[in-house]
Amino acid sequence: MYCDKGASSLANGLLPNVSGDITAKDNILDALDSSAEEHFWGRYIDGFEGQIFPQIPVSVHEAHLTGRARYEIILGNSMVTTLYTVSSIIRTGWALLVSQYTESQDVVIVSSLELPSQAMGGTILFPIRFRIRQDGRTEELLQSAKKHADKVLSSQKHDFPHTKDFVDPFSNSILLICTESQPSHSLEELLTELSASKKCALVLRCELLEDKISISAMFDPQVVRPRQTRRILDQLGHILKQISGSDMLVGDLDFLSPEDRQEIGRWNSRSALSDECIHALISKQAQQNPAAMAVNAHDGNFTYGELESYATRLAAHLIHIGVKPGNFVPTLFEKSKWTQVGILAILKAGAAFVMLDPSHPPARNQLICRKANACFALASAPCEPVLSMAVPHVITLSHSFMEELGRLQPPHEQKSPCLDPRAVAYLLFTSGSTGQPKGAILEHRSFAAASRGVVAMTHMSSTTRTLQHSSYSFGAAIVEIIATLVAGGCVVVLSDTERLSNVAASMVAYSVNWAFMTPSFARTVNPADVPCLRVLATGGEGVTSDIVETWASFVSLYTVYGSAEQSSIAAMAGPLATHQRGNSANVGSPFAGCYAWIVQPDRPEKLAPVGCVGELVLEGALVARGYIDEVESTAAAFPKGFSWRCLFPLHQEGSTRFYRTGDLVRYAVDGTLEFVARRNGYIKLRGQRIELGEIESQLKAVARQPYEFCVEVVVPKGETADKAVLVAFVALGSAYTDNEICESAISSPEQFDQGILVDVLGHVEERLAETLPAFMIPRFFFPLQHFPVTSSGKIARKILREQAAQMSVLQLAELSLGSVEKKELQSDMERYLRSVWVQLLGVPEDFIGANDSFFRVGGDSLKAIKLFQRLRRDGYNLNVTSIVAAPTLSQMARNCSLLD
C-alpha cells in the first residue's frame, strides 16, 4: 500500500534479524528483481505463528474509523535516542505491546515510511516481523528495526508490485510515522485510502515534533472500545519511555502502565466480607421463619424448624460418638431430603462434610474417604455398604433413626462447639493430574461469602425455590443447597428419575423458580416448558450466544464462574439481555472478599496490561486453603504471594491466600472478567471439570500392556463445540501391520491388528468404570503406531486433536473398538431400539450391533435424555439411570418395558 508518486515500486521490506545480529539477509533486496518479489514475501511471512491485532469480531463486516483519541509523550535525551531514530523506537515499542495483546513472541506490524523527496517521494506501508525473546535485549530489537527501515530506503530502484498482498493480512492495525517536514497531502491520501479499505480497525498516527511525540488514534469502536484505545496509548507511552531510556532485557520491561495500575486497584477496592459460619446463617433463618419450607423433596419435606431440630439432634449424636472439630465426614446419598440434614449436622458438630455421588464407582468413593482420613460417615441404607468398606463408623440416616435419637437423646446433652469462621467447612474433590482425585479444603467464611454473593446477585429470598439438580460431587450442588438456605428459600430435591428423565415437567410440578444448569443441559430444556422459572444461572463450561438468545427473554439469566478451589462460585455476571449474546464470555466481578489479578501467562511475577489476556489469580477468603495431603500440588496452585502485590495497599484480613486458576481471561472495559480459555491440562466438558492426566494415568494402570496413552478433547467433523468428546489416543507400536506408516498420520482400521488391539484394550472401559465416573471415560480409542512429537520431544497434542477433528463421529467410532465383532440382533425389541438409535444418532443400521454401547456409537448423557423421551412417547419405559448403567443395545432391550 502506498501514496504519492512512485510508491508502488517501493512498498517492500525485509525480515528483521530476530537475534539482533545483522547478516547477509540484509542485502537480499539488492539481489531481488520483480519476478522474485512474490516468492520473497512468501518466504518472509512463512511460518508466522502469531496473531493479528486487533482481532475483528465476526459480527463486524466492515471497519469504520470513526473513533478518535490523542496522546503525547516526551522522550528524554539518552544514549538510545542518540543511536536510534525515534521511528525505530516507536516501531519496536508498538511490536512489544502487540506481543502482549497477541500472547505471541512472533509479531508482524505494518508501519509507514517516508521516502526522500529527491528520490520518488511519498509514503509507503511495509511489514516488519519481530521475534521477541524474554532473554533478548531491547537494543537488539531497535537495531533490527532500524536496519530493516534503512534497507527499505536503500532499495528504491526495485519495483515490487505484490507487496500490498502481503501487507493486507496484517493491516488490522497500522502505525503511521510522520515528521514536520513530511508533505501533509501524502499522509492524508494514505489515511483516506485506509479508511476506504474498511479493513483497518486501528490507526496510530505518530507525529515527531521538535520536543515530543504526538499520537493520534483512529479506531473502530466496534472493534476497540474508546476506553481501551486510551489504555493502549497509555501502555505504548509507558513502553516507549522505558526502551528509549536505556538498553534492558525484554523480560525486565514493565508493560503495566501507571494508569493500568490505578484502575486495577480501583476495581479491587471492594468492601471486606464479614466472617460468618455457614450453619449460623441457616440457624438464623430457622429462628426467624421456623414454619417456612426449607426442603421440598420427593421423599418428604422439612420446614426450617424441623431442619434445625433434626440437624441439631444429629450433630449432638456425632459429637457423642467421637466426631471432633476438623474431622472430615463423608456423606453418600441418593437425591434425598436427608442430605440437607446430614451436611448441616456435620457443620454444627464442628466437622467438615465431604459429599459423594452414588453414581460414581464405589472404588473412587472409597478412595476419597481414605484420602480424607474419615472415621465417620453418613449414608442412606442402599449406600451404606460402599462406605463401610472404607470408613469404620457409618451412620445410616433415616426417619426411624432420627426418631430413635429423639427418644434416646436427652435434650441439649451435647452443645455444638463454638466455631471460628476460619474453620474447615467442607472438602471438595476434583480430578487430579497424579491419577487420583485431589480435595480442596474450604473454610466456613469462604463459602459463606460465596453464598452471600449469590444471594445478593440473583435476589434470592424466602420465595426462592431452587432446583437441586447438580451431582453431589459437583460444587454447584453445594451452592444450590447452602445459598438457598442462607437466603431462607426452599431446596427442591427431585428423585434421580425425575431429575434425569423429565426435569421440565418436574420443575413445573414443584414450582421451581431458580435453577443452575450447564449450557449443555440448558439446551435440552425449552424455556416455554418451564414457565415457573425466574432465574437461570449457567456455568461449568463456556456460555455461548445461543444460550443467551434462547433464555434471556424468558428468565433472569446469569453466567457463573468458579471452581472447587474458589468456593465453587467466585463471580457472576447478569442478568443478560438478548442483545448481549456477543458478551456471553463475561463472567462478571468476584464477590466481596476476593480480589482478581491477571498475570502474564508464563511470567506470573508480572501483571498483564489491562485488556491483554493473562492467567487469572484470585486472592482472599474465597480461596481454598489448598489440597489435602498434596504438598506439591498445593505449592504450585496456591503460591504464597507475589512481588507486585505490595503495589496495591488493599484491605486484607490477616494472612491472605492466592490461587492460580489456570484460566486465561482479560479485563473488560469496565473491569469485569472475560473468560478466554484454559491454559493447562484441565478441561471442562459438559460442566464437569476433568484433569486429562488422571484419565491417562488410569488407562496405563488398567491396560494389559505398557502402552502410552494421550487423552484429548476433540470436536468431531461436522459437530459444534458443545458436542466435543474425549478421545484416548494409544501408541501401539508393533501392533501395526504397516511399519512404514507416517508416525503423525491417523491410521485406518486396516493398518493395525485389531485382534491385538482388542486383546490389549478390550476390557479397558469396564476397568475404567471401576475407578472413574462415566463423564471421564473416553468415548473413542484412537490407535497410532507412535505419537507425533514436537521439537522439544513432547507429545504433539495439537496434531492429534487436529487430525482427529477431521473425522466424523461415525468415522471415529469405526476406528475405535466399537466396530469390532458386532453381534447380530435377536429380538424385535432390539430391532426397534436400533431404529430409534439410528434416528437419534444419525448412524447407519449396519453400524449398530447387539453388543454396541449407546455411548460408543455417538450417544452422550444429553442424548440419553432424548432417548428416554422418545421411548416414553412410543409407550415404553426406560429411564436415564438404566440407560447409563446398561448402555448396550441388548441390555436396553432387556430393561425396556411397556408403560403402565
UniProtKB/Swiss-Prot annotation:
**Modified positions (O-(pantetheine 4'-phosphoryl)serine) in chain numbering:** 861
Q: Which residues form the Carrier domain?
A: 824-900
Molecular functions (GO terms): isomerase activity; ligase activity; phosphopantetheine binding
Pathway listed for it is: Mycotoxin biosynthesis
Keyword terms of this UniProt record: Isomerase, Ligase, Phosphopantetheine, Phosphoprotein, Virulence
User: What triggers expression?
Assistant: Expression is up-regulated more than 10 fold in toxin producing cultures.
Transmembrane helix among keywords: no
InterPro entries linked to this entry: AA_adenyl_dom, ACP-like_sf, AMP-bd_C_sf, AMP-binding_CS, AMP-dep_synth/lig_dom, ANL_N_sf, PP-bd_ACP
The record describes the protein's role as: Nonribosomal peptide synthetase; part of the gene clusters that mediate the biosynthesis of AM-toxins, host-selective toxins (HSTs) causing Alternaria blotch on apple, a worldwide distributed disease. AM-toxins are cyclic depsipeptides containing the 3 residues 2-hydroxy-isovaleric acid (2-HIV), dehydroalanine, L-alanine which are common for all 3 AM-toxins I to III. The fourth precursor is L-alpha-amino-methoxyphenyl-valeric acid (L-Amv) for AM-toxin I, L-alpha-amino-phenyl-valeric acid (L-Apv) for AM-toxin II, and L-alpha-amino-hydroxyphenyl-valeric acid (L-Ahv) for AM-toxin III.
Description of its domains: NRP synthetases are composed of discrete domains (adenylation (A), thiolation (T) or peptidyl carrier protein (PCP) and condensation (C) domains) which when grouped together are referred to as a single module. Each module is responsible for the recognition (via the A domain) and incorporation of a single amino acid into the growing peptide product. Thus, an NRP synthetase is generally composed of one or more modules and can terminate in a thioesterase domain (TE) that releases the newly synthesized peptide from the enzyme.
The protein depicted here goes by the name: Nonribosomal peptide synthetase AMT10
Q: What is the organism of origin for this protein?
A: Alternaria alternata
List the gene name: AMT10
